Every structure is written in C-alpha cells, then in structure tokens.
Amino acid sequence: MNKKLLALYGLKWNPFSPELPTEALYITPRIEHFYWRIEQGLIQEGGFALITGDPGTGKSVVLRLLAERLGQLRDIAVGAITHPSSNLADFYREMGDLFAVELKPHNRWGGFKALRERWLAHLEATLLRPVVLIDEAQEMHPAVLNELRLLTSLHFDSRTLLSVILAGDARLTNKLRREELLPLGSRIRTRLTMEYAGREELMACLKHLLATAGN
C-alpha cells in the first residue's frame, strides 16, 4: 500500500502488512498472562518456557512481543538464536555473538565445560540476566538442548543465570518426551499453546488493527 492510499484512508501504516509495528500487534489476554508469568517468574528463577502451536498460529509474534518488552527491563539482555539447527560448537559461537563474549571451543572433550565456565565468568562480570529466544526449536539437536539445560542450572550469588523461551510445533513437544531430554522438560516453568483464532477473536483483531493504524 503506497503513501497515497494510506493518506486516502487516513492510515499511518498498512494494517494488513506482515511487518506491523509492535504497538499494532493484537495481544490476547492469554498472551498477556504468559508474558506476566515470564516477567514475574521465569526471569527471576531461570529455566525454560515453551510456546507450541501449528504454523500460522502466532508463535513468532509472541516471541517478538517478548523480545521488545523484556528488552526494556533493567539488567535484562535478550538474544534470539537464528540458527536453531546448529551443532554445539556453532551454538556457542552464536551465543557469544549475541551476548558479547568469545565462546569458541578449543578441543572436543573439555571445550564445552570451559565455555560454560567462561559464560559464568562473563555474567558475573556484567551482572546481566540473559534471556534466549529460540524459534523453530523443533530443529534443535538434543545435545544443544541439553547444553542449554546445563547453562540454566548455573547459579551465582543466588541468581539463576539463564532463561530460555522455546517456540515450535508439535515436533518440539514430541522431542522433549525423549528420555535424554526429560530432565529439560522438568524445568519448563510455563507453557503457552497457540491456536487458530476463532471468529470473535478475528473481529477483535481487525478492530484493533484499524484503530491503531488510523491517524
């Protein structure tokens, strides 16, 4: 939609664009409650949160909302993993890039333990509380998921040093039922199941979009 059409209909932006500003997103009470549990519980205690649902139900929108809101909180550093299918070494490299610390394994056996120690030292020095967002988490290798569990178990001065929010489809739920990932499942503190919107919710969303897009 070009500027002339936007002006003709009195709109600040196209309300049907996939690239909506955050204030235009329609947030249901269930999503608000999920965010409240993240802010008041997860980032205080650490561990995992889980968002599941079929493609197109809004999982990525929820992650976008969380990234913006959590990023405004004091002492919180938010990072989004963009390569969920990476191996363990590449996962650590991406974590290092996200949180400004060098995390490159130097040997196969003791390397990842050394990286956990370096990660801990970095957080002790910065006093930041990191939150990691991972979309399409069903693509993650079990070894990487287990490494995340180990990182969320690290503590310093009674502070849990990592919170992780996973989002994925039914394959993620099935993967977390594997025996080697059961310890991770026990650390999921809050869950949100996304569903396709019904008629009333769609109408409420449409009204919200038009109201926020209007001049």
Predicted feature locations:
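Conserved catalytic segments around the Walker B and adjacent sensor/switch elements
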Residues: 72-83
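Conserved catalytic network of the ASCE P-loop NTPase/AAA+ motor domain
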Residues: 40-44, 69-74, 121-127, 138-143, ...
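Walker A/P-loop nucleotide-binding motif
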Residues: 44-65
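Conserved NTP-binding/hydrolysis module of P-loop NTPases
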Residues: 11-18, 86-105
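A short, basic N-terminal segment
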Residues: 1-45
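Helix-loop-helix "sensor" segment of P-loop NTPases
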Residues: 121-127, 131, 156, 165, ...
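Short hydrophobic/aromatic beta-strand immediately N-terminal to the Walker A/P-loop
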Residues: 48-52, 79-80, 133
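Mid-core helix/loop region of P-loop NTP-binding domains shared across ATPases and GTPases
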Residues: 6, 87-91, 102-147, 156-159, ...
